Amino acid sequence: MEKQLKQFYKFLEVDKKVSNNTLQSYKRDLKQFSEYLDEKGIKYNKVTEQDIKEYLEHLSEEEGKKPSTISRTIASIRAFYQYEVKNKKTMQNPTENIQSPKIEKRTPCILTSQEVELLLEQPKDVDLKGTRDKAMLEFAYATGMRVTEIISLNIEDVDLKEGTVMCKNGSRTRTIPLGKMSLDALKEYIEDA
């Protein structure tokens, strides 16, 4: 199964152009699944729907995994077997009839304007680290970008003259305007760095 997994990971990286975080999630999920199969003496191309159900039960009851983790695991295993079926490495996808568990939708905790102001005042720009942290917080607040998106930015992704940033997420790219505070904090960090 190791050889097949390597080919699948290459497909995800090269053809699907998934983000590094997504790729790492697939690797983690499928490594754990592969170890389970080895432990049970089951060949990957002989896995049945019942084997999948027992594995998911193992994750839930013995390992205490949350429904969201189990749902992601199902998606990883399903994608791997879809790839294998498409490439005629196995005859059928044992996850075809497997349903993902219901996931409770949690409403995000929204900060008040006062809390946001307090947060943005936290980094003291007395050194480069403080200037960087202030720029990142202003940037995150102004753009709504995730931390992983911000730290993967390159200097060429930011247009200081236009006041925009190009956010690349996998194969998608979007242009996001920067606010004045964010732009000023970013310029200060670039000048100090």
Q: Can you name each region flagged by the protein language model?
A:
Residues 1-193:
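Conserved catalytic core of the tyrosine transesterase superfamily
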